[in-house]
Amino acid sequence: MNSLLYALIKALRCHRWLRLLACAFIFSSLGNGLTQVVVFGLLLAWSAPPALLTLAFLFATVPGFIGSTIGEKLCSRWSPISLLILTEGLGLLALLFPLLGVGYHSVAALLAVQSTEALLSGMSWPALTLLFKRGLSEAELPAATCLENVIFASQVLLGTGLGVVLFQKTSVFTLLAIDAASFLGSLLMLWLAGRRFSAPSLPSSGEEEASAALRWRTLTVRQKRSLLLLPSLAAVGSPAMALLPALAQQIHPQDAAGLALPLLFARSMGQLCGPMLLKKESLTRFAAHTPRIIVCLGIFLASYGTLPLLSGWMACALGAIFIAHLASNILFAAGTFGVLSSFHLTQTASASGKAWRWQTLSASLFTGIAAAVAAGFGSVAALYAVSSAALVMVALIVRRYRE
């Protein structure tokens, strides 16, 4: 019973604030997933070109760079719970954008809600990581890693799952009303979690500033690898994930939305199940073993590469996406655990913010390249060329920083 799932269940039984926090983010993820269904479903229904579909993914990542910087700074002044409540409240207000998009048939408004969600996600990531570091013991950190993956996966597992069922059976306004209710539920759960959480005394501002100044030359090899794992995953994974709606449009133009949304659901199932295959003790060893990293990324890319060949085989296409994200989220779990376990408490917010920004830059760069290639040569060629080049680059980088 050393799996990450067992570690999470044990931690949830010990900490009431953690149970409330988990409920809050499940509510929030439900709303975020519904928002994604509305955005991509409308773009597909409006027959948006492949380059625009890919840029929609880009707009959902780039503002996270700014958000993580803001979140990192606010973590030194606000409690993590207060910052999380702020981001959820702003997320509720951001639902005005899709309302405008539907009312005025505005693609810009749909992209604006993607950008706002990315900004708020970037703000919340350092706060969430710092909250785990303060509230959990070192032995319980694998539980935090598992919970982060559950939060990440439930966005599509719950939100997109419900959206797949309801998108073509109910109005967009009904979906947005459910979305708003989920944000209100999240705000309530976060407020209750804040009342139950008791943090240790904070370090002095001078000590925190000194500790939080992360300089690359002074970091250990393990710390450097921890910061590089998530950007490496983004370099290989983001082009493929961004091209997924466009691939569906190219493979099955008669019913692109009917194919793309189940593929997104299969993606989330893989994201949820992948970390459950790991044991607590294997997290550190996995992050330090370069061949395992390359194998996971290779499985991810190979699975996506088979999609153009599976146009008439829906079940096989869903299975390929499931396997791809099973592999990628094993690596995601190793990366998030590395940031949590490799840095001191006063460095956690800075380290997680830096990892998020590097991940955002990596995703933005390679997604932008994929969009340009897709516009000129098609989404299939973009998938093979960009993600393969990224995989070679990642292999060279992780080999350079071997432990």
PLM regions and their residue ranges:
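Juxtamembrane intracellular "pre-TM" segments in multi-pass secondary transporters
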Residues: 1-18, 196-228
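Hydrophobic core of transmembrane alpha-helices in multi-pass small-molecule transporters
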Residues: 26, 106-123, 315-330
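Intracellular juxtamembrane helix-capping segments at the cytosolic ends
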Residues: 39, 123-136, 330-343
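Transmembrane alpha-helix termini and helix-breaking/packing motifs in multi-pass membrane transporters
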Residues: 40-46, 99-101, 158-178, 250-251, ...
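C-terminal transmembrane bundle of multi-pass solute transporters/carriers
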Residues: 60-91, 250-403
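Cytoplasmic helix-loop-helix junction between adjacent transmembrane helices
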Residues: 113-154
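Helix-loop junctions on the cytosolic side of multi-pass membrane transporters
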Residues: 176-204, 399-403
